[in-house]
UniProtKB/Swiss-Prot annotation:
The lineage of its organism: Bacteria, Pseudomonadati, Pseudomonadota, Alphaproteobacteria, Caulobacterales. This is tRNA pseudouridine synthase A. Its EC number is 5.4.99.12. It catalyses: uridine(38/39/40) in tRNA = pseudouridine(38/39/40) in tRNA. Keywords: Isomerase, tRNA processing.
Length: 249
């Protein structure tokens, strides 16, 4: 039974998150329905990450096991044909070994958060950015973000419903930069806690608008207390932009 690695792009707005749910539209459910329409198989896909409602992806990675040995390009084209009415696209399909796993073989996940920082609201990007009217100091955010890099107890930035056994995570990259009218936050780590990225983003935004200092961010991290977190940024501006695997650049 050949295993296929699929790279997926999607707009998270129409879906109640990635994970399949019986009575709500989901990214996983749409992809699995497309596989069934193509092959007749009822399957479960595995994903590198399960994004929340409204969160987008430019390079989510999933794998699927098919009964027939189809050419990878045929799989990609067929799934896209069945996903044409969905806000989902298969960007690439590759045959991988049976022991390769989209989630457990991953050693890095990359997220981008987009803040639109101008007075005028978004007309074309509504639901795809967080609109913040007050001027943001991206340099101050970048300085404060460095306190989060490294191995830490991220209890402060962990959702109360998070099911991870440990709050310890190693954040490899936290980078903030201004790109025109937008402020971009990039985070890279092997894995993240539930809503960790949005919690860090909302907290750093408090620094950007002058309500918090870098020392406040450090104090919040060291408090190991969810109530010490700043506001949680909305899902709108968050994108899963890449998943890294050993041996890949």
């Amino acid at each position: 039974m050949p295993r296929y690695r699929l790279t997926i792009e999607y707009d998270g707005r129409p879906y109640n998150g990635f994970q399949a749910q019986a009575s709500q539209p989901s990214v996983q459910g749409a992809i699995e329905a497309a596989v069934k329409a193509f092959t007749g198989q009822t399957i479960r896909i595995a994903a590198a990450g399960r994004t929340d409602t409204g969160v987008h992806a430019t390079a989510q990675v999933v794998h699927v096991d098919l009964e027939r040995d189809w050419p990878a390009e045929t799989v990609m084209n067929a799934l896209n044909a069945h996903l044409v009415r969905e806000a989902i696209s298969v960007l690439d399909a590759v045959v991988v070994s049976d022991d390769w796993h989209a989630r457990f073989s991953a050693n890095e996940r990359r997220y981008l958060y987009r803040i639109l920082n101008r007075r005028a609201p978004p007309a074309l990007e509504r639901g795809k950015v967080w609109h913040v009217k007050k001027p943001i100091d991206a340099d101050a955010m970048q300085t404060a973000a460095q306190a989060l890099v490294g191995l830490h107890d991220f209890t402060t930035f962990r959702d109360m419903a998070c099911q991870a056994k440990s709050p310890l995570k190693t954040l490899d990259v936290a980078r903030v930069s201004r790109v025109g009218d937008e402020v971009h936050l990039v985070f890279e780590a092997r894995s993240f806690l539930h809503r960790q990225v949005r919690s860090m983003t909302g907290t750093l935004a408090e620094v950007g608008v002058g309500r918090w200092t870098a020392d406040d961010v450090m104090a919040a991290l060291e408090a190991r207390d969810r109530t010490a977190c700043g506001p949680v940024a909305p899902a709108d501006g968050l994108y899963l932009t890449g998943v890294g695997y050993e041996g890949e650049g």
